[in-house]
Amino acid sequence: MTKFSEFGLDEKIVKSVNRMGFEEATPIQEKTIPLGLEGKDLIGQAQTGTGKTAAFGLPMIHKIDQKSNNVQALIIAPTRELAIQVSEELYKLSYDKHVRVLAVYGGSDISRQIRSLKKNPQIVVGTPGRILDHINRRTLKLDHVETLVLDEADEMLNMGFIDDIETILKEVPAERQTLLFSATMPDPIRRIGERFMHSPELIRIKAKEMTALLIEQFFVKVHEKEKFDVLSRLLDVQAPELAIVFGRTKRRVDELSRALDMRGYVAEGIHGDLTQAKRMSVLRKFKEGKIDVLVATDVAARGLDISGVTHVYNYDIPQDPESYVHRIGRTGRAGKEGMAITFVQPREMGYLRIVEETTKKRMQPLQAPTWDEAFAGQLRVATEKIQEAITEENLADYKTFANELLEKYDATDIAAAMLKMLAKEPDKTPVHITEERPLPSRGGGGYKGKNGKGGKGGGYRGGSGKGGSYRDRNNSGKGRRSGGGSGGGSGSGGGGNRDRRGGGEQRSGGNKGNYSQKSK
């Protein structure tokens, strides 16, 4: 791996990168940064979470003329969330060079953006619609742009932004450097490369590199009506630090977040129908740890850069395999382990095989925990919390009252009462989740991607679109919920039950199982 100090970047940029805690480049950065510094056009096929913002951002910042008041670089992103995330990262990367970075996007006060544009940003990040709006108002001038980046171009294609992008490209000088990043390479994206780029270099990060090798991937075969109870029990057993639950539709997200809240989990949802202010508020609370479970659609979560996500639950298997890679890419980042669990209805097993072909990794079958196992996991984590308090906390102020209790009650009864207070008993509160049909079975139809092109395999047709860290529900104050944990029983994780796909079926319980250990 190459160190950032070896690329020949401005020393101020290297200082900023080191401040962020990065020393060695990721594969996409190692391949992109030298070409970016040379001014070459390039097409990068890479997923979110591979470090591509720094890959195009570092050469861009290196070439910015600090004395110029012109917009010298433009990044076009499909969503407001991604535009904000990219601008924040560019700000950090350019902190010591003092480059002015601005994000412009819909759903925000345009007059405030106009005032910010008058302060002469040198890098502008924005969504296609809002960039065009500013161009038409003559509040954004692009005649001095030297570097243009199209980020997540395939997603912009899916969202119908290609015409807007072509209009924007005509406003930028022909003599420029253009960098295009896309998870997939459908024909319309290739045509943009042919029409608007000069002999671009192609950089491809292979699927096995994109699938986050540190992510453990499991599937649970479950009927639709049983999904929510299975999700509840998994959350109780595993007690993830931060979790994202993916639903296929906006209605699904609303119902899941409401149902999780009814059962005491600190959960909120995001999807495209929420106001920008609401979406940013939810994301801010999730990043700050005030929300333990974020429920999201694919589009709403695209491009999110949230550290600390330990578990991703695919409540619905995604309609195209690329979306699966994006979903699980929310976890297992920055060298940390993550876990992805996908719920699959019996009629959807063909979809599972196509996802596995895309990721080049076989998912392990997982048996859903029982209510007893979920409760055993709660008790185990409560026990761990007590043990941690005994070894790590200063208990001198409490010993007088503890001795008084011991004079009145048996020590075992006192310990049992503590466990009862800390452990969450199984919550079977009735909830309403509208049942959705499984994805249609396509026996032998082959995989048809977003452009309808045939592929290998049968049974899949892609769509056109795209422990104890929970808050304590039993106590007031700022304490964390003691639920979840290591799982019940003393089983060993790997089971002997084999399904027709082969491989041992993992149990969600088991103190020693690699599946059930509490996330650290």
Curated annotation (Swiss-Prot):
GO terms for molecular function: ATP binding; ATP hydrolysis activity; RNA helicase activity; RNA strand annealing activity. Its EC number is 3.6.4.13. A motif (Q motif) lies at residues 2-30. Keywords: ATP-binding, Cytoplasm, Helicase, Hydrolase, Nucleotide-binding, RNA-binding, Stress response. PROSITE patterns: DEAD_ATP_HELICASE, HELICASE_ATP_BIND_1, HELICASE_CTER, Q_MOTIF. ATP binds at A46, Q47, T48, G49, T50, G51, K52, T53. One of its GO terms (cellular component) is cytosol. Residues 428-520 are annotated as: Disordered. Belongs to the DEAD box helicase family. CshA subfamily. This is ATP-dependent RNA helicase CshA.
